[in-house]
Amino acid sequence: MTTKTRSAPAVPMFRRLMVANRGEVAVRIARACDLLGITPVFAVSAADRDAPYTRGRESVCIGAARSPQSYLNMQAIVQAARQRECTALHPGWGFLSENPVFAALCEAHGVTFIGPSPRAMHLMGKKTPAKQAMRAAGLQLIPGSDGILADVDEARAVGGRTGYPVLLKAESGGGGRGMRIARGPDEV
């Protein structure tokens, strides 16, 4: 059995990348950076200064142990990236990874945000407008409602039209929150 490995580009796209996350997320990003010949720089809270993944690596403290003062502090993270001459920033997942304001702040300060553009985040941030945009782009969608349903009767009508089971989703739910499977009209 042969295994194919990807080689790093001769010249990496970015020389230094700010890792704006912690734990396993930071480890995975650093591993990818190493493979690509990019120097990862860890943005860490005071509590994570001596985390195993930072040993022998460059890190910068961005605030107190609590995440609102560190991993959610947009200004501190972008300032740290600029101070450490990072031309790119990887948010990982969670924290600020889906925050269009943060992505725009990175762009405004000349730091490439590794992730969707602020425009894409705004467009895809809510289920109904996202679905409308995808339909307008000619993409095929899973059958369902065309927007927010007014009541249980409307949900049952959609289920009757598309067939059960159906997945009911809260408009502002995210990450699996606010979802429920209804296997028939009596479960709606």
Residue spans of the language-model regions?
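N-terminal beta-alpha lobe that positions the nucleotide/phosphoryl donor
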Residues: T2-V188
